[in-house]
Amino acid sequence: MARFPITIKGFHKLEQELKHLKYVERLKITTDISTAREFGDLSENAEYKAAKERQLLNDKKIYDLENKLANAEVIEITKINSNSVKFGARVVLLDRDTEKEVVYQIVGEYEADITQNLISIASPIAQALIGKKAGDIIEVITPKGGRFYELLKVQYVDF
């Protein structure tokens, strides 16, 4: 797995998810397996099979999260001093079609959440913004065609 950028906040969120899977979910599943064993014949025990499937799924999630954490490149965005857009930037854009301002923060792919205006570094809009400065006009290609934005402000602050 290649290294990937992530904010400190995103890294801690993945750590918390891993702890929950290891110390809460795993314990619950182990208890469910023990309880299901008491029902008798394991070859026809649906509860046992379901609990074992949940155990496999949980173990896979744990493995995946451990790999993500091992390959994460934590970026402390408040220490970035730049007037151009890079990973971690909070940008204020003016949509040239609607004349409405929109604010996005560019984050890693595992912490993106459009409902919180957190966009992945791999997204088309983030890719169009990388390297740009306040005052630049950018075009983002969407399935409905090009969309133009004016970059009003670039900041490096926590979200």
Swiss-Prot record:
Keywords: DNA-binding, Transcription, Transcription regulation. Gene3D superfamilies: Transcription elongation factor, GreA/GreB, C-terminal domain, Transcription elongation factor, GreA/GreB, N-terminal domain. GO terms for biological process: DNA-templated transcription elongation; regulation of DNA-templated transcription elongation. The keyword Transcription applies. GO terms for molecular function: DNA binding; RNA polymerase binding. SUPFAM superfamilies: FKBP-like, GreA transcript cleavage protein, N-terminal domain. PROSITE patterns: GREAB_1, GREAB_2. Belongs to the GreA/GreB family. Necessary for efficient RNA polymerase transcription elongation past template-encoded arresting sites. The arresting sites in DNA have the property of trapping a certain fraction of elongating RNA polymerases that pass through, resulting in locked ternary complexes. Cleavage of the nascent transcript by cleavage factors such as GreA or GreB allows the resumption of elongation from the new 3'terminus. GreA releases sequences of 2 to 3 nucleotides. HAMAP family: GreA_GreB. PANTHER family: TRANSCRIPTION ELONGATION FACTOR GREA (PTHR30437:SF4). NCBIfam families: greA, PRK00226.1-2, PRK00226.1-4, PRK00226.1-5. This is Transcription elongation factor GreA.
